[in-house]
Amino acid sequence: MDHISKKCSMNAIVGTTNAGKSTLINMLVGQKVAAVTPKVQTTRVRMHAVLNNENVQLIFIDTPGIFSPKTKLEKFIVKHAWMSLKGIENVILLLDVKNYLNKHIEKIISRIKQSNINAILVVNKIDTVPTSSVDKAIEHMYSLHSFSKTFTISALHDIGLSRLVDYLCEISPNGPWLYPEDQISDAPLKFFMAEITREKLFLSLHHELPYSLSVVTEALEEKEDGSLVVKQVIYVTKDSHRTIILGKKGEMIKKISMESRSDLAKILDLKIHLFLFVKVREFWQNHLDECVGYVE
């Protein structure tokens, strides 16, 4: 394909916590590139996901949910969320239709206005409420900002996504692609693999597990038979958290390992040998540069 005919755009997805940003990213790209759990604050750093649609490359920037930061980790997360608005064509405000009165939305819109970037409103989870509630949410959002376009979707059930993609392709400027045709994410392999395990932890320990954990892929080793040995460390802040993750007679950590290994094997098309270790590191959130792989 002649590069002159190619189009490319950067599209940041912003919104409050648990609006469905990672689910939307994964559905658009067609593969799991971001952790998806029912809990808030599961996206921690900016991640670029890539969708190639004929002659158009759409790059989506998966950002953390916006919330009031307290620890160094939380401040790091919020800083990276707003950094995503630099050098992009479009900002997509993803709205949970049942949470349109969230106190943080006006702050987000204020930052969007300051950026002077084309803003698109995408109302998510429309399958969970009547049409009248969707209309009410849209009316409220337009009282705060004049969006260039509005889409109503259910990211989880792939409703309305094709219209959103078609529109983004239509308005993308001419230009060369920024990523190779077969690349769907810019997340380093170790980070990507840690995200898979972190997702399984949150899904399995939905009520017991706090956010004060991190998963780090410490070692990858390719064996002669082509399989991959993966060693990961789960950092927690308390011994009680470690006990929860291990489970009775180690059953929970075995379950997490099996589910993560299965996903990794399917996605990478490799046999995976996964070894998980749980370590207690008090206040690791305030030591980002030492053990948990958060770097700027």
Curated annotation (Swiss-Prot):
The UniProt entry's GO CC annotations, sorted and at most eight, read:
cytosol; plasma membrane
GO terms in the biological process aspect are: ribosomal small subunit assembly
Q: Which UniProt keywords apply?
A: Cell inner membrane, Cell membrane, Cytoplasm, GTP-binding, Membrane, Nucleotide-binding, Ribosome biogenesis, RNA-binding, rRNA-binding
Provide the residue span(s) of the region labelled G5.
Answer: 153-155
Stated membrane topology is: Peripheral membrane protein
Domain of life, per lineage? Bacteria
Give me the ranges of the annotated region G1.
15-22
Which compartments is it annotated to reside in?
Answer: Cytoplasm; Cell inner membrane
Q: Where is this region: G2?
A: 41-45
Q: Which InterPro entries match?
A: G_ERA_dom, GTP-bd, GTPase_Era-like, KH_dom-like_a/b, KH_dom_type_2, P-loop_NTPase, Small_GTP-bd
Give GO terms: molecular function aspect only.
GTP binding; GTPase activity; ribosomal small subunit binding; small ribosomal subunit rRNA binding
Q: Where are the transmembrane segments?
A: none
Please list the residues that bind GTP: 15-22, 62-66, 124-127
Q: How does it assemble?
A: Monomer.
Similarity section: Belongs to the TRAFAC class TrmE-Era-EngA-EngB-Septin-like GTPase superfamily. Era GTPase family.
Recorded protein name is: GTPase Era
Native source organism of the sequence: Ehrlichia chaffeensis (strain ATCC CRL-10679 / Arkansas)
Name the gene: era
